[in-house]
Amino acid sequence: MAKAKFERTKPHVNIGTIGHVDHGKTTLTAAISTVLAKKGQAIAQSYADVDKTPEERERGITINASHVEYETKTRHYAHVDCPGHADYVKNMITGAAQMDGAILVIAASDGVMAQTKEHILLARQVGVPKIVVFLNKCDFMTDPDMQDLVEMEVRELLSKYGFDGDNTPVIRGSGLKALEGDPVWEAKIDELMDAVDSWIPLPERSTDKPFLLAIEDVFTISGRGTVVTGRVERGVLKVNDEVEIVGLKDTQKTVVTGIEMFRKSLDQAEAGDNAGILLRGIKKEDVERGQVLVKPGSIKPHRTFTAKVYILKKEEGGRHTPIVSGYRPQFYFRTTDVTGAISLPAGVDLVMPGDDVEMTVELIAPVAIEDGSKFSIREGGKTVGHGSVIKTSN
């Protein structure tokens, strides 16, 4: 059967529910789809539909994640809900489902719990720009003073982790009652979605960002010069644009003299294109796979950085033994792999497979990276971890 064509009539946004176990994330996800389905903006999903999450094999790790699709008046959403805490950690660190924003679910009856804090911190580290709070189970915890107290605590926590705690929308509702069709609580879901529409920013389209192409191959066309090929990760490139070649060696400046795709010449290449770029005055030996072609000044080479890393379990094809400071695996960024030595934080002697940790890495050669850059860690031909750069330093 042919797949239905995706009609792009509204801007698309990826969001997810985050928060402590049993605070009602999955019930809320089901409630959103059920309430919006009544307006023809979603297909209703029951708790069981959302809960029977398909296993996704994403970059060698198993992530259980459920994707629900729905629309509001102004936007189209893909909503990810993960059943287990470990799945959220993996999902967010690897960027398996990039979140443009998140709905933090907190049970009014429990308040802020350990995973509430961890998910907020993780959201900050992986670059989720804004969070909307849904204070759940308000049909059960009816005391407004208690609800006020929890709201105050959440706002302080958001501010502590660098979010705008004072202005973040906090909606008080009941996912369960809304799912059961109680109109008072259904209205709270509408209120929540209005807040999501207005508070969570539309993601910047990749074409609006500064140009970056990860170089996959280099060859010479006699009489014309050196061509680099690769996929345009973001931005737009035009003939005669000035570009920099960054990473592995000293940064070089050059000018684009031609752009080709499918053996046809183009005026410009944009995000998503696999293109060949002809460069002025560059010898084949001056450039290599693993470097990036970028808009001048938009990204710098770094040898040291701090990252949030998830170490794969042995069942996920990872190591059987823990890692310690001084461990020297390969770090894979885009089209390059570079050896690096890790340093664990003070007081952490080792990291077990299945754990996540913040670590500092020192590479043997500089690589073009920035906050949020994703990478894999490999040794002996197998992937042993995934990470996300939190902070670069020279």
Curated annotation (Swiss-Prot):
- Region: G5; residue ranges are 174-176
Q: Where in the cell is it found?
A: Cytoplasm
Q: Where is this region: G2?
A: 60-64
SUPFAM superfamilies, A to Z: EF-Tu/eEF-1alpha/eIF2-gamma C-terminal domain, P-loop containing nucleoside triphosphate hydrolases, Translation proteins
Q: Which GO terms describe its molecular function?
A: GTP binding; GTPase activity; translation elongation factor activity
Which parts of the sequence belong to the tr-type G domain? 10-204
Region of interest (G3), ranges: 81-84
In this chain, the stretch annotated as G4 covers: 136-139
What EC number is given for this enzyme?
3.6.5.3
Q: Does the keyword Magnesium apply?
A: yes
> How does the record describe its quaternary structure?
Monomer.
The record describes the protein's role as: GTP hydrolase that promotes the GTP-dependent binding of aminoacyl-tRNA to the A-site of ribosomes during protein biosynthesis.
Protein name as catalogued: Elongation factor Tu
Provide the species name.
Answer: Ureaplasma parvum serovar 3 (strain ATCC 700970)
Q: Which gene encodes it?
A: tuf
